[in-house]
Amino acid sequence: MNIDLLLYIVLFSQIMFVSYYYPRRLLIRIHTIFKNYPPNDFPKLYPESIDKYKKSAKRYQVMNHLIIVLGFSLILWFYVTPRTGKWDQAIVFWYFMIQFIPNLGIELWSMKYHKAMRLLNQDAQKEAVLQPRRLTDFISREFLAIVFVIYVIFVGYVAYLDQFDYPWFGGYLNVLIISGTYLFFGFIIYRAMYGKVKNPHQSYEDRKIDIQTLIRQLFSIAIAVTIYAMIQISLRAFGIEAYKAITISLYFHVIGYLSMQWPRLDFINFDVYKDKPALTK
């Protein structure tokens, strides 16, 4: 198959997956919460007006629709403009960064939402769960072993290629970058396990599920990042760099999929967001 045609197909898939399917799944989840857990019955779930949250959800949808249009325009530009392919990978990368902007907005909104919830419930008392938290409480030793083995394979692969003295090869700088990524993920995991509670109402069981989901996501992304780094190095070593833009787009598919692993709503205890009944004399 023609490389350009394959790039158009993969990029079209990236547009629809990251800017249509992913937001659609998230919006269905949000509107399901609005419908099944309304403010009148679950007032603690809404520190601000539900209309404000609905407007934010609408803005998120509109932003993604505009990014879809931009993506289709990008494919058209690829088709009609003569190019060498040298900048295709960079263009696909920066388009994904644009696709990420609405989701970054959701993350910032989530931080503001939890801050408002804490400010309104500063006197809330939560029962402490006296249980030590270890990484293996949230993820299996087998999964950790897989992550470690893939990291060791990556280090060994870099060491093997380093002996050929490729002028373009960064050598152990690649190991430093990947190791830095692992350390950054480790810092996020540490904050999640031992940091300040974001949601003052959330039950311990729900928080444990959230932490478990986050850890699985980050370790899965760490695996994806490491494998992608090996693929990119291999494409350069074997002289098939024309596929770089395609592989980075496929990589973004994987990142999008891994980011979409949310706890099921029916597993969440929403009763904690109800008003406590008044005591009768």
Model-derived regions, located:
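Membrane-water interface of transmembrane alpha-helices
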Residues: 18-38, 100-123, 183-201, 260-270
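N-terminal leader/presequence-like segments
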Residues: 1-86
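Short, Lys/Arg-rich cytosolic juxtamembrane segment immediately N-terminal
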Residues: 50-66, 132-141, 211-217
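Internal, hydrophobic cores of structured domains that mediate oligomerization or house catalytic pockets
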Residues: 85-159
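Juxtamembrane inter-helical linkers in multi-pass membrane proteins
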Residues: 31-46, 115-134, 194-212, 274-281
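Alpha-helical transmembrane segments and their membrane-interface junctions
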Residues: 58-85, 144-182, 222-255
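Cytosolic/matrix-facing juxtamembrane and C-terminal tails of multi-pass cellular membrane proteins
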Residues: 188-281
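Alpha-helical transmembrane segments
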Residues: 2-20, 85-105, 167-187, 245-254
